Amino acid sequence: MAGNDGTLAVVHEPEHSRFAVHAEGRTAVLDYQRVGERLVLPHTGVPRELEGRGIGNQLAKATLDWAREEGLRVVPICPFVRAYLQRHPEYADLLTRAEPS
């Protein structure tokens, strides 16, 4: 289902530990693992048929907004999410800090 601005709806599927977009019989996902007060983001997957529509960006934004609402720190393992965070410094406060050595 598309919104008024043409974006597809992102749904939170906590039973599967992911955010998802369902379109054209396909599913794009951003998986997460909640570990205490941290949200580990290991994988984003967008089917080839859905690429080029900004769906990965929508998934990243929804996931990071949810992490902020929940007061979680983010551990971005997924290269796509890491690149998204570099392009969107407004989420820098969500990143975990390195442990002191």
Model-flagged regions — what are they?
Residues A2-T44:
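N-terminal first-folded block
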Residues E15, E51, T96-P100:
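Short capping/connector residues at structural and topological boundaries
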Residues G45-E51:
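A short, internal acetyl-CoA/4′-phosphopantetheine-binding micro-motif in the GNAT/acyltransferase core
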Residues G52-T63:
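Conserved acetyl-CoA-binding loop-helix of GNAT-fold acetyltransferases
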Residues W66-S101:
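C-terminal structural segments of small proteins and small subunits
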